[in-house]
């Protein structure tokens, strides 16, 4: 019964936001509360919700100060030279801009953190999309697809969870996946080409100069004399993120404080800069805490466990020898409907144990489980996706509708490549 309620809750939630009946923020709060009450968990509801919000508090704090930090960097003109370089290359061609978005996203994604990837990519590319009148859903979609493929690098979250859950080594899981990952990269570039070609057909090639657009209000905020300082500060921040020098919220809080103090030493200026980015920060962070309500109820009611076991039980014994392929396919809905932690620590060991009865190595199941990551990033349970849509200025539901077929296509392409090369067996 819990499993059925869990699936119905997810379906209702998806319908409400994709049909624009409710905003994602309201749906994340109201829908799980209603279903928890129907399930008879009214007495424990408060504790579940607070636990969910508490679990996501560090993420919310990190995103708040990350938005403020990169907002200061944009105001100061840190990304202006990069935008000028990109402009000189793309020459007002939407196709080149779309492909450039894919390449930039996947390059930055090497740091293993989706938040910084979206921050830098959107900060660099959004002005170009605005100047040419390109569809921002193309920007958000390509950025998410690129991040989805690169999300399986060893220092990213999913692969680390697989290694910990199944007690495996990087050489057993990630190294064999590299050819499939390359296939995914080529697919994302191909998708960017297709979407860019559509935008070129709609808009044409537009003649623009090679300098970032001049906004009279933005000019006084530029800090060309501090360009190198801001660049070094950002590089140091990225290095600290990769090496986990300090917790992410602390790193972004510290970097923001230093950036604001150096670039805008006047207290009134500091207040204006914070106010200028407060709206964007509020939109994203409120969504994260609302997602905490959703995940808290999903976990606290044990709906997520019931959903996992019911899905695993649907796999017939006759399909046992094909578990690697089945795992690759079901990793899409599994990681969409539940968090990576729930899937990789709760469901994956069960699948791996079942596969061992058919002589299938746990490493093969681990590799297969990572192929659904491009779809996972469309889940309402992924905080960084709210940052992406917030910065790009698109609705969560529209982003899902626009990107879902391309995300599923990414998983299919990577799975076919994995089968052909022998990374996973049929």
Swiss-Prot record:
Any single biological process term in GO: citrate metabolic process
GO terms for cellular component: plasma membrane
Record-level Gene Ontology MF annotations: citrate transmembrane transporter activity; symporter activity; transmembrane transporter activity
Membrane topology according to the record: Multi-pass membrane protein
Protein location: Cell membrane
InterPro entries for this protein: Cit_transptr-like_dom, Citrate_transporter
Source organism superkingdom: Bacteria
Keyword list, A-Z: Cell membrane, Citrate utilization, Membrane, Symport, Transmembrane, Transmembrane helix, Transport
TM ranges: 1-21, 22-42, 59-79, 86-106, 137-157, 176-196, 232-252, 278-298, 318-338, 343-363, 377-397, 406-426
Role: Transports the free citrate anion. Probably cotransports citrate and at least three or four protons. The citrate uptake is inhibited by the presence of magnesium ions.
Record-stated family: Belongs to the CitM (TC 2.A.11) transporter family.
Protein name in the entry: Citrate transporter
Protein source organism: Bacillus subtilis (strain 168)
């Amino acid at each position: 019964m819990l499993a059925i309620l869990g699936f119905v809750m997810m379906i209702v939630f998806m319908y409400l936001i994709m049909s624009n009946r409710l905003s994602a923020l309201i749906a994340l709060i109201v829908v799980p509360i209603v279903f928890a009450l129907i399930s008879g968990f009214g007495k424990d509801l408060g504790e579940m919700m607070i636990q969910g919000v508490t679990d996501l508090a560090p993420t919310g704090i990190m995103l708040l100060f990350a938005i403020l930090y990169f907002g200061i960097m944009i105001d100061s003109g840190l990304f202006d030279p990069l935008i000028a370089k990109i402009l000189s290359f793309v020459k007002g061609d939407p196709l080149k801009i779309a492909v450039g978005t894919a390449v930039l996203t996947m390059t930055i994604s090497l740091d293993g953190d989706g938040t910084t990837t979206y921050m830098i990519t959107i900060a660099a590319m959004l002005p170009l999309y605005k100047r040419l009148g390109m569809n921002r859903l193309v920007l958000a979609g390509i950025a998410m697809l690129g991040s989805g493929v690169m999300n399986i690098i060893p220092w990213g979250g999913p692969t680390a969870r697989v290694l910990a859950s199944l007690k495996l080594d990087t050489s057993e899981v990630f190294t064999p996946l590299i050819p499939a990952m390359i296939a995914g990269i080529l697919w994302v570039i191909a998708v960017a080409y297709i979407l860019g070609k559509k935008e070129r057909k709609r808009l044409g090639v537009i003649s623009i100069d090679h300098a970032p657009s001049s906004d009279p209000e933005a000019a006084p905020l530029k800090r060309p004399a501090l360009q190198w300082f801001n660049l070094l500060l950002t590089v140091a921040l990225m290095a600290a993120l990769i090496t986990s020098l300090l917790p992410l919220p602390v790193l972004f809080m510290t970097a923001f404080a230093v950036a604001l103090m150096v670039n805008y030493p006047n207290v009134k200026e500091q207040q204006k800069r914070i106010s200028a980015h407060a709206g964007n920060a509020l939109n994203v962070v409120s969504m994260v805490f609302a997602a905490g309500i959703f995940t808290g109820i999903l976990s606290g009611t044990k709906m997520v466990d019931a959903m996992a076991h019911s899905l695993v039980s649907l796999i017939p014994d006759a399909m046992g020898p094909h578990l690697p392929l089945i795992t690759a396919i079901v990793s899409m809905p599994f990681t969409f409907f539940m968090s990576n932690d729930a899937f990789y620590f709760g469901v994956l060991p069960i699948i791996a144990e079942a596969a061992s009865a058919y002589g299938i190595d746990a490493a093969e199941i681990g590799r297969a489980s990572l192929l659904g990551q491009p779809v996972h990033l469309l889940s309402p349970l992924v905080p960084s996706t709210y940052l992406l849509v917030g910065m790009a200025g698109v609705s969560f539901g529209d982003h899902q509708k626009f990107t879902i077929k391309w995300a599923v296509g990414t998983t299919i392409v990577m799975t076919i490549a994995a089968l052909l090369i022998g990374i996973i067996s049929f």
